[in-house]
Design a protein with these regions (language model features):
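Carbohydrate-binding surfaces of carbohydrate-active enzymes
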Residues: 1-174
Length: 174
């Protein structure tokens, strides 16, 4: 136990804590999936996430019942008095997934008290005449201007902005 605790403390304090200090000095926001789902890593995930300005988890679009750490990120935010609980969102969303399916995932994350999404997307789309364009080395990053529903997706994004804004106004509940 002592060795594991020492390693967890070093990762939390000397790595994530040091990065947060450097970001503070530079005036840079710092969000991190601090140790995340690194199950083989000797760490205290709540402690590590508590050392960063914005604790972050992630949820994937293809594993709707996956082992996500979004509740861990929101718990760290609550325990350590942080207003933002962040999540990498919609990782590996496919072109065949509808906005309704993605909204269900968003609602799942909001229920876990996540109030900031960092959308996993491929904004790099250099070609104007090739579809689906660059999808990120075989990954299914469909959340970009080349998706056929993109021009109709504004209400989807507005909904998420409203939910995140509303959640940041309140206080977490148990």
């Amino acid at each position: 136990y002592d060795l594991r605790r020492t390693v967890a403390d070093v990762i939390s304090d000397n790595y994530f804590g040091t990065l947060q200090t450097l970001c503070n000095k530079a005036g840079v926001d710092f969000t991190a999936q601090a140790t995340g789902n690194g199950l083989s890593l000797v760490a205290d995930n709540l402690q590590a996430k508590g050392r960063v300005q914005k604790p972050q988890g992630e949820f994937w679009a293809k594993h709707i019942h996956g082992s996500y750490d979004i509740k861990e990120a929101s718990s760290a935010a609550h325990i350590y008095g942080k207003r933002i609980a962040s999540a990498e969102a919609y990782t590996d969303a496919k072109f065949s997934q509808s906005l309704a399916e993605l909204k269900n995932l968003a609602d799942f994350a909001y229920a876990a008290q996540v109030n900031e999404f960092v959308v996993c997307a491929s904004a790099y789309q250099p070609w104007l005449d090739k579809y689906p364009g660059s999808t990120g080395g075989g990954r299914h990053y469909c959340l970009n201007r080349n998706n056929t529903y993109w021009e109709y997706s504004r209400p989807f994004w507005d909904y998420q902005a409203r939910c995140a804004g509303l959640m940041r106004k309140g206080m977490p509940v148990d």
